[in-house]
């Protein structure tokens, strides 16, 4: 029996997946059969009705039994109500009271946990029953029931039951639903709504298709909330809203009315309805036509989720259910019950009860994995990791990696490992070996952890060997990027050296080997490789690891590679490699020696003074433009040696400078005139020396050379009287631009006169201004008060008795004396002067004020 049940479950799952095969849309519901006790019941009996409470289920059968079941379908209690079919079961909201009616006219309302009971037998089948939702309360002891008429039973204050007819005369009552203060029921003509508070019927909604037999295609009712009623009948669905009538409209009308807010047709016959948020769950009875016999047959019922619109609906999902015996069932044999609290939907048929549940995140992930949407599944699991129960993020991630590997997306698979494997070192190592098996170690290498966690050295070495065999550049990149403590450095060094035996000039391998040596602190070997390769990092290596002792015999190599950087490094580290050592090492390479000594001289004119004599020859040979600046700046250069070298090489400018520096200005001037034939330079030289004899020699040399005379006339006006030159010009000599030169001389002379006159005016004006200022200052009054003292006797300058006569002398220097304290002026020097200022050589101050009283 268990095997048969398992096969049926698989069949149910296959049927619900039919629409999934046609579409990639995810189903909204999942299904399972209600088994255990239900299976035993339906093997011997058939289900006729069921009602659902949050805590338990109540199932009625064709043999008059009512079973209470837990949510797994286990039987908890059994009631023998009637020998015939149970038509309907009703529970109050508390789940403590139940009403049952049967085909033989029996009616029972009783407490499940108390002795409270009401029973009645009618002479006609009782089709429906609904107890008040708050039946547990003494003020709400009411229920409705009916067959051909709808009766309301109420318990009076004397604990007796009385009944009243709410409606009759429109055929059998086939469906009823009670919500709050509203009762909705359906008969052959339509749906009525009754307000239990006002005791008024407030609406009548007629059925659309009167051609359908109401006993074969019964009406389905459900309340979405206290004011929203959903009606399904035939292929029509109506959503009705109970509204309050405005006071001005009431007159003799009920205070409430029903408005149809949405109405639309469906493709199939409706067997049941249930709300799902703002959507509807619809159980449909399906008839199809056989292609072979062209006869109608009963197809599998469908459970659809639809989105109601004002005049139509949108299908969200649709599942065909393979319930037991569906080929023999009619529309009236199916019922849809639901649990509002847990969104559970029960599809009830005579031989089967199927539970539909909203799919949770685990189900969503199942579907994504089934559709091989691993990326979305992983994302969904991460977002809902607190809510998922059956799935683990790691398992989904590993499945995703395997999927990518199977598809050949090795780089993507390796990239995802970073996120999925995280800090799990053992999983990392496992995945690396998997990549090795498929020959894709290179793909995972960029994503291996390098810090936290750290894998076994063998893992990193295995990948390095893989690159070393096929990709030198990739190998070099990994060596640069990976910290050296990840692997056994000596093992990799030996592997590289083995490869260099086959290709000794491979620059990539040599450079990588140098980096490995550097990490291994074998700087000497690394330095040799860098120098051989002329690698730019050689200077950084020397500085960083203080390898100056290792380069003392490699200075020429460094200079050949980059003389500028080498010289800067050597000069910055004179304390480690002396100037003498560098000069000795470069003895056979004078051009490099010059570069070094030249930079040394630029930094400090005195440090390399012992080599200044050598530098004369070096500058003359390799850098003449800097020879003259060197001669000018050096104070340790032997002038005779320098003069000898410059004369040998016929360096005129340098020779002129040396001659002038040695005091032989006349020879220097003569050389300028005879060798350079440059009157401007000669004039400039004469100006620098500022020697009259030189000007005389210059005039004598130029007197028979008209171009030189022109140059002199144009330039000597501010240094030598031009008349001396003009008087010596031979009569009749043609001098180029003589007029312009004379005009320039006159202009220069006139300019000098103007400058002198201007200076004179400024001087006179300043003197007059200062004189006036001094006069104004001396004319000002001088304050004399009790605090002033006589500079001679040091007593207060003013007497304590103001009535006594006194005489005070105040000089322009502001020193004050009693008149009697000053010596009397002599006949030879009638003017008086301040004794203090005269003694300090500040100049005599004359009296400016004499106060008497």
Swiss-Prot record:
Its main location: membrane. It is found in: Endosome membrane; Late endosome membrane; Early endosome membrane; Lysosome membrane. GO terms for biological process: autophagy; endosomal vesicle fusion; endosome to lysosome transport; late endosome to lysosome transport; protein targeting to vacuole; vesicle-mediated transport. Residues 1-32 are annotated as: Disordered. A zinc finger (RING-type) spans 790-838. One of its GO terms (cellular component) is early endosome membrane. It is a peripheral membrane protein. The keyword Lipid biosynthesis does not apply. Component of the putative homotypic fusion and vacuole protein sorting (HOPS) complex; the core of which composed of the class C Vps proteins VPS11, VPS16, VPS18 and VPS33A, is associated with VPS39 and VPS41. Interacts with RILP, MON1B. Interacts with ARL8B (GTP-bound form); involved in recruitment to lysosomes and probably hierarchial assembly of the HOPS complex at lysosomal membranes. In vitro can self-assemble into a lattice. Associates with adapter protein complex 3 (AP-3) and clathrin:AP-3 complexes. Interacts with STX17; this interaction is increased in the absence of TMEM39A. This is Vacuolar protein sorting-associated protein 41 homolog. It comes from Mus musculus (Mouse). The gene is Vps41.
């Amino acid at each position: 029996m268990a095997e048969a049940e398992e096969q049926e479950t698989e069949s149910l799952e296959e049927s619900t997946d039919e629409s999934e095969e046609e579409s990639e849309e995810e189903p909204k519901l999942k299904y399972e059969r209600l088994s255990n006790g239900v299976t035993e019941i339906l093997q011997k009996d058939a289900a006729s009705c069921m009602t659902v409470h949050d805590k338990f289920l109540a199932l009625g059968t064709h043999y008059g039994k009512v079973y209470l079941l837990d949510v797994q379908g286990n039987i908890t209690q059994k009631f023998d109500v009637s020998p015939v079919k149970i038509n309907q079961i009703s529970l109050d909201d508390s789940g403590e009271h139940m009403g049952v009616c049967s085909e033989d006219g029996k009616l029972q309302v009783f407490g499940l946990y108390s002795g409270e009971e009401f029973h009645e037998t009618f002479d006609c089948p009782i089709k429906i029953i609904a107890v008040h939702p708050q039946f547990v309360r003494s003020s709400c002891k009411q229920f409705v029931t009916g067959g051909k008429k709808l009766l309301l039973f109420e318990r009076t204050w004397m604990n007796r039951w009385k009944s009243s007819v709410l409606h009759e005369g429109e055929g059998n009552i086939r469906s009823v639903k009670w919500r709050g203060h509203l009762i909705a029921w359906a008969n052959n003509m339509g749906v009525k709504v009754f307000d239990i508070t006002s005791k008024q019927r407030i609406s009548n909604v007629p059925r659309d298709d009167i051609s359908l037999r109401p006993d074969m295609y019964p009406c389905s009712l459900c309340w979405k909330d206290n004011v929203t009623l959903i009606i399904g009948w035939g292929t029509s669905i109506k959503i009705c809203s109970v509204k309050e009538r405005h006071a001005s409209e009431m007159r003799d009308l009920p205070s409430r009315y029903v408005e149809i807010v949405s109405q639309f047709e469906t493709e199939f016959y409706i067997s049941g309805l249930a709300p799902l948020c703002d959507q509807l769950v619809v159980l449909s009875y399906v008839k199809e036509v056989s292609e072979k016999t062209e006869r109608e047959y009963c197809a599998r019922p469908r459970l659809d989720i639809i989105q109601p619109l004002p005049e139509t609906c949108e299908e969200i999902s649709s599942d065909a259910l393979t319930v037991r015996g569906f080929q023999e069932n009619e529309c009236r044999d199916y019922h849809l019950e639901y649990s509002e609290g847990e969104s559970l939907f029960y599809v009830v048929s005579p031989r089967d009860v199927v539970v539909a549940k909203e799919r949770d995140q685990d189900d969503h992930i199942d579907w994504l994995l089934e559709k091989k949407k691993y990326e979305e599944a992983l994302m969904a699991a991460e977002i809902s990791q607190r809510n998922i129960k059956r799935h683990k993020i790691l398992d989904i991630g590993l499945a995703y990696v395997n999927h990518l590997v199977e598809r050949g997306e090795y780089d993507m698979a390796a990239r995802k490992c970073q996120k999925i494997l995280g800090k799990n070192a053992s999983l990392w190592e496992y995945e690396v070996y998997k990549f090795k098996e498929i020959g894709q170690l290179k793909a995972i290498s960029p994503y291996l952890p390098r810090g936290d966690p750290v894998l076994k050295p063998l893992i990193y070495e295995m990948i390095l060997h893989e690159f070393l065999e096929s990709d030198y550049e990739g190998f070099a990149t990994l060596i640069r990027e990976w910290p050296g403590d990840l692997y056994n450095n000596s093992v990799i060094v030996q592997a590289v050296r083995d490869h260099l035996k086959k290709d000794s000039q491979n620059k990539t391998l040599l450079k990588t080997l140098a980096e490995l040596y550097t990490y291994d602190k074998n700087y000497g070997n690394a330095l040799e490789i860098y120098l051989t390769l002329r690698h730019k990092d050689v200077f950084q290596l020397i500085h960083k690891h203080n390898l100056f002792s290792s380069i003392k015999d490699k200075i020429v190599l460094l200079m050949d590679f980059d003389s500028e950087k080498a010289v800067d490094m050597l000069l910055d580290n004179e304390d480690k490699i002396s100037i003498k050592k560098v000069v000795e090492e470069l003895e056979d390479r004078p051009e490099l020696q010059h570069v070094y000594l030249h930079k040394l001289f630029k930094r400090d004119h005195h440090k390399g003074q012992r080599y200044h004599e050598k530098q004369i020859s070096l500058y003359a040979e390799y850098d003449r433009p800097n020879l003259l600046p060197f001669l000018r700046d050096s104070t340790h250069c032997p002038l005779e040696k320098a003069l000898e070298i410059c004369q040998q090489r016929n360096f005129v400018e340098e020779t002129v400078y040396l001659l002038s520096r040695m005091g032989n200005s006349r020879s220097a001037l003569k050389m300028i005139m005879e060798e350079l034939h440059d009157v401007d330079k000669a004039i400039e030289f004469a100006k620098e020396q500022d020697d009259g004899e030189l000007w005389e020699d210059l005039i004598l040399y130029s007197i028979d050379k008209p171009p030189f005379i022109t140059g002199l006339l144009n330039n000597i006006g501010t240094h030598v009287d031009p008349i001396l030159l003009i008087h010596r010009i031979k009569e009749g000599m043609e001098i180029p631009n003589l007029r312009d030169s004379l005009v320039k001389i006159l202009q220069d002379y006139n300019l000098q006169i103007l400058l002198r006159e201007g200076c004179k005016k400024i001087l006179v004006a300043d003197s007059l201004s200062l004189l006036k200022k001094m006069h104004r200052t001396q004319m000002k009054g001088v304050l004399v008060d009790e605090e002033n003292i006589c500079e001679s006797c040091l007593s207060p300058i003013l007497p304590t008795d103001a009535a006594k006569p006194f005489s005070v002398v105040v000089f322009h220097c502001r020193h004050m004396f009693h008149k009697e304290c000053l010596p009397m002026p002599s006949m030879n020097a009638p003017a008086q002067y301040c004794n203090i200022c005269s003694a300090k050589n500040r100049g005599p101050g004359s009296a400016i004020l004499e106060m008497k009283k």
